[in-house]
Amino acid sequence: MSGLREAALVAVRDLMGATPGETLLVVMDGGTRNVGYALYQAAAELGCEAMAIEMIERTNHGEEPPAPVAAIMKHVDIVLAPTSKSISHTTARAEACAAGARCATLPGITEDCMARTLGADYAAVGARSRRYADVLTRGATVRITNGEGTDITMSLVGRQGSADSGVYHNPGDFGNLPAGEA
């Protein structure tokens, strides 16, 4: 079994919790076509009513997908969006989740990245992400430095940490794959 195929099965079956008969839409562009079709094929193999739409690559991160794509996103159980530019912070994605879709975006994903990262132990990823989110929630200040001269200090007061576990099984769930952010 190829690394990309196995990673696609993990994404659809384990991380999105897809079950036979659920509707699953893959939104992709020319730069992510191979990843998109691997996800589509995994969904079909698992018995989902799989659909794939290839749109023209967006110019910027956060640019809305075409209106017909946004409309379909609101009428499916699961949206997987491996796109060259992120659609995470778009009205289309937010409205799809508000309508009950489970959504995962995979901005800039490559075949190699997907094959290497989606086989991670997502129970451990989620636990680590929640632990760091809790630290951020309880913290007052964060300072970020590196050897290249970065030295940023900022307040965390009034901010809530948010864990991205990579597991999106409930209606309206959303996050990025690969996951693990806090």
Regions found by a protein language model. Give the residues of each.
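Active-site bordering "gate/hinge" segments
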Residues: 1-182
